[in-house]
């Protein structure tokens, strides 16, 4: 039975989301034939012209703006010239796996003869470059260690690597702490004083930039017979997958990278492993979207790192054998099915615990929630924290034993707008030294570890910090809508255009509309979801809609105010549309 650790701190707030429409923005000049709806949506996201909405690779920020990039190139040039053994160390999430694959593939393309890779096992090594992982890596006899998507917080691991005489290049995108690891070179756009404009590069984006800088140096040195060198854009399928899956903001720089990667995937030019993964997931490669990456490809790759070993996912991304790729993709499909079952059971536990908390607090929601269960899996706590954060609209941390019966816990934190979760953990750490063993992350997500006997003290300290940092107004969930769709916009043409537009994601959200509908009929699917038939004046017949996870035992009102996404109904085919309901409120 899970225990809730934040039942003693509540603040009054409305549990009903507030749907608020975006301010109207007049779009700029668009080519003839552009749907007015699309132009309006782009403009409301700060991209009022085609150049801003659809950035090209030519608009990418220069690699030279990254602090340490020249020194990183120097390390790699020297390693390649002297046939040194280069070991790329990835991470056990999708960003870390794609970053590892990009690093290995890219360095080999640029002439490195001895490139190896490794990745920590979540259950065995924990996060990042740890001393125990360094001890195992010694068997590979590396000369140069290149971390991707981690390293900025791995002080002990870097010290252990340097003690063995290895050079260390850290490439990362996570926020640095007050003290940097003693690596030979660090490349991280979030270093203090770094001039790179896009602070939202994923780990895979950082290593891609290092490779671009390396190729430019080699071009200028006359290394390539054709004067150009290898085409690094062939790696953008991997860059796109890692960037979208890591939920970094899709600013113009990232949108240029993701758009180019999606074009390759849609054209069937992705690596063998990603093509097999798309097939295994049942997606149509020719119509692949960023949403497909986030909800189909990313979870399947992440499943390996959550329940098994991300070495399997990296093997998929590096293989050139279609048969092997299909076999690995099917294995990942099975692991992902297991992950879904584990996640559902843990989520059910968490929901029951939080229901008891709310009842104990006379219907008030806690200002923050910390959840722990001795039987939970550490690889899935992040998904549970995310689900509970969405349901409560509160910061949530979910903990599990690092391994069965262990006294060390691994936690995953998810936050809401208004609370920078990594800064909150940093403040707890500063006020209570030694309470948290390790932590790191971003504004909206973080990871941490601590001893089981420190949990109660941490709970009190964390809640105190949340009460101090979080404006009570932030506890009222704000749902930002793109407004109401006209009757003639509720059609397959507009739904299809929205699907293939974007790419949508963090910081450039997928369009969400709102409107008032009459519920003609409804039924429950799989004991969790609501399937509705709706009527809207001016629209002939009825409109299909589905609210995933929307069944909580109460029938919907006859008249409802919906926040929804417009989608094609792939099951009905033809010109059918379906509304994907995000919020259902009585009208």
Question: Residue locations for each model-derived region?
Answer:
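A residue-level signal for conserved active-site and pocket-lining positions in enzyme catalytic cores
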Residues: 42, 146, 302, 498, ...
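A short acidic, amphipathic alpha-helical/loop segment
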Residues: 156-160, 369, 384-387, 493, ...
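Histidine-centered active-site/metal-ligand motif
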Residues: 173-174, 377, 442, 529
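Flexible glycine-/small-residue-rich
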Residues: 90, 148, 170, 189, ...
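N-terminal amphipathic/basic leader segments beginning at the initiator methionine
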Residues: 1-28
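Active-site cavity-forming subdomains of large catalytic enzyme subunits
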Residues: 135-204, 208-225
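Mid-to-C-terminal polyanion-binding domains and interfaces
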Residues: 74, 78-82, 322-371, 405-407, ...
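Hydrophobic helix-and-loop "lid/oligomerization" segment in the mid-to-C-terminal part
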Residues: 22-141, 164, 182, 216-453
């Amino acid at each position: 039975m899970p225990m809730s650790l934040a039942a003693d701190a509540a603040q009054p707030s409305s549990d009903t989301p507030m749907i608020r429409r975006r301010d109207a923005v007049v779009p700029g000049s668009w080519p003839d034939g552009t749907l007015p709806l699309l132009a309006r949506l782009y403009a409301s996201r700060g991209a009022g012209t085609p150049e801003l909405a659809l950035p090209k690779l030519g608009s990418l920020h220069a690699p030279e703006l990254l602090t340490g990039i020249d020194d990183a190139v120097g390390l790699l040039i020297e390693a390649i010239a002297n046939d040194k053994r280069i070991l790329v160390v990835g991470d056990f999430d999708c960003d870390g796996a794609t970053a590892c694959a990009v690093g290995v593939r890219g360095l080999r393309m640029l002439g490195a003869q001895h490139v190896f890779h490794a990745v920590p096992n979540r259950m065995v090594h924990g996060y990042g470059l740890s001393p125990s992982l360094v001890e195992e890596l010694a068997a590979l006899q590396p000369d140069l260690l290149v971390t991707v998507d981690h390293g900025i917080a791995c002080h002990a691991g870097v010290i252990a690597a340097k003690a063995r005489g290895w050079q260390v290049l850290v490439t990362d995108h996570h926020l640095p702490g007050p003290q940097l690891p003693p690596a030979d070179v660090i490349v991280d756009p979030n270093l203090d004083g770094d001039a790179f404009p896009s602070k939202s590069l994923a780990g895979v984006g950082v290593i891609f930039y290092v490779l671009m800088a390396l190729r430019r140096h080699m071009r200028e040195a006359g290394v390539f017979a054709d004067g150009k060198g290898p085409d690094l854009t062939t790696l953008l399928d991997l860059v796109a997958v890692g960037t979208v899956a890591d939920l970094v903001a899709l600013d113009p720089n990232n949108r240029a990278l993701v758009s180019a990667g999606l074009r390759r995937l849609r054209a069937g030019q992705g690596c063998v492993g990603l093509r097999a993964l798309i097939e295994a997931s049942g997606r149509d490669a020719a119509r692949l979207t960023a949403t497909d990456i986030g909800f189909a490809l990313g979870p399947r790759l992440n499943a390996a790192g959550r329940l098994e070993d991300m070495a399997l996912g990296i093997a998929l991304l590096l293989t050139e054998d279609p048969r092997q790729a299909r076999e690995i993709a099917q294995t990942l499909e099975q692991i992902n099915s297991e992950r879904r079952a584990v996640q559902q059971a843990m989520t059910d536990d968490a929901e029951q615990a939080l229901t008891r908390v709310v009842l104990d607090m006379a219907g008030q929601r806690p200002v923050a929630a910390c959840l722990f269960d001795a039987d939970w899996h550490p690889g899935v706590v992040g998904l549970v924290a995310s689900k509970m954060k969405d349901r409560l609209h509160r910061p949530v941390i979910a903990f599990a034993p690092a391994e069965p019966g262990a006294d060390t816990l691994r936690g995953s934190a998810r936050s809401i707008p208004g609370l920078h979760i990594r800064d909150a953990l940093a403040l707890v750490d500063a006020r209570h030294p030694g309470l948290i063993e390790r932590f790191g992350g971003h504004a909206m997500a973080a990871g941490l570890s601590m001893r089981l006997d420190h949990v109660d003290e941490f709970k009190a300290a964390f809640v105190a910090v949340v009460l101090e940092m979080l404006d009570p107004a932030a506890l009222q969930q704000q749902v930002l809508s793109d407004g109401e769709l006209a009757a003639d916009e509720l059609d397959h043409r507009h739904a299809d255009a929205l699907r293939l537009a974007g790419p949508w994601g963090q910081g450039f959200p997928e369009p969400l509309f709102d409107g008032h509908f009459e519920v003609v009929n409804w039924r429950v699917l799989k004991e969790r979801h609501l399937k509705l038939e709706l009527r809207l004046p001016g629209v002939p017949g009825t409109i299909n809609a589905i609210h995933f996870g929307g069944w909580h035992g109460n029938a919907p009102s006859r008249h409802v105010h919906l926040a929804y996404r417009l989608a094609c109904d792939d099951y009905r085919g033809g010109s059918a549309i379906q509304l994907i309901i995000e919020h259902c409120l009585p009208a």
